[in-house]
Amino acid sequence: MLLGVNIDHIAVLREARKINDPNPLDALSICKLSGAEQITIHLREDRRHIHDNDAKAIIEQSSLPVNLECSINSDIIDIVCKLKPSRATLVPENRNEVTTEGGLDIKGNFEKLQKVIDKLHANEIEVSLFIDPKDEIIELSKELEVEWIELHTGTFANIYAMLYSNLASTHHSIKELELSKSELKTKLSKSIKQIETSSKLAKKLGLKVAAGHGLNYQNVTLISKIPEIEELNIGQSIIARSVFTGLKQAIIDMKELIKND
């Protein structure tokens, strides 16, 4: 199982004090030496963490492939084409969101996506679509002739957290998931099944399958066991653990959990 380490949250720490430390660039060699196969960053329209100069330096200096997450905003796509990351993962964006809340609306943006994908391909950039695990969306993604899809695991992660962590007893409790344990277990089972079904369909259609969002040290093994998924992109939980263990050990710990024996 390949691991892409999202280093956005190093920039989040920097931006919390509006200074130049910590520098996300310093994470590159640690990620490689610790066994990561990819660096993932998100160049948001609002530049809330990673900035243009960060993205440029990371892409130029990383010895690992860089997966650049971005919206389909034309100005952002122009920047991505100049930066030339190994891969661009197209994601939805909402300025008011804390983090990405769901997958792309493929059906509603099909024509615009086709133009964006064609432009990225013309610049020799591999393309992935960040999507919800639904069969119709998988099939539309295939029509768009992308190389990858990344399945949004946020719903799965939220259900898992409400069931097996103390999230429900905190001020971050997810109101719509304040259900009985039996109801949450049923929802979790259905969520995993849908991810499995979508992964199988995508693989059958010739798409490479990644997954990410909300994955952590507690829930990741349920996703890493799905054989059709080749890659996981994980950020916040790794950076959070690194505060206590150091980044190298945090990555090693995650690699150990997701390895395929």
Curated annotation (Swiss-Prot):
GO terms for molecular function: pyridoxine 5'-phosphate synthase activity. It is an enzyme of class 2 (transferase). It is found in: Cytoplasm. InterPro entries: Aldolase_TIM (IPR013785), PyrdxlP_synth_PdxJ (IPR004569), Pyridoxine-5'_phos_synth (IPR036130). The active site is at 42 (proton acceptor), 69 (proton acceptor), 213 (proton donor). Its EC number is 2.6.99.2. Pfam families: PdxJ (PF03740). One of its GO terms (biological process) is pyridoxine biosynthetic process. It comes from the Bacteria. The record marks 150 as: Transition state stabilizer. It catalyses: 3-amino-2-oxopropyl phosphate + 1-deoxy-D-xylulose 5-phosphate = pyridoxine 5'-phosphate + phosphate + 2 H2O + H(+). 3-amino-2-oxopropyl phosphate binds at residues 6, 17, 214, 235-236. Keywords: Cytoplasm, Pyridoxine biosynthesis, Transferase. NCBIfam families: pdxJ, PRK05265.1-3, PRK05265.1-5. Homooctamer; tetramer of dimers. Catalyzes the complicated ring closure reaction between the two acyclic compounds 1-deoxy-D-xylulose-5-phosphate (DXP) and 3-amino-2-oxopropyl phosphate (1-amino-acetone-3-phosphate or AAP) to form pyridoxine 5'-phosphate (PNP) and inorganic phosphate. This is Pyridoxine 5'-phosphate synthase. It comes from Aliarcobacter butzleri (strain RM4018) (Arcobacter butzleri).
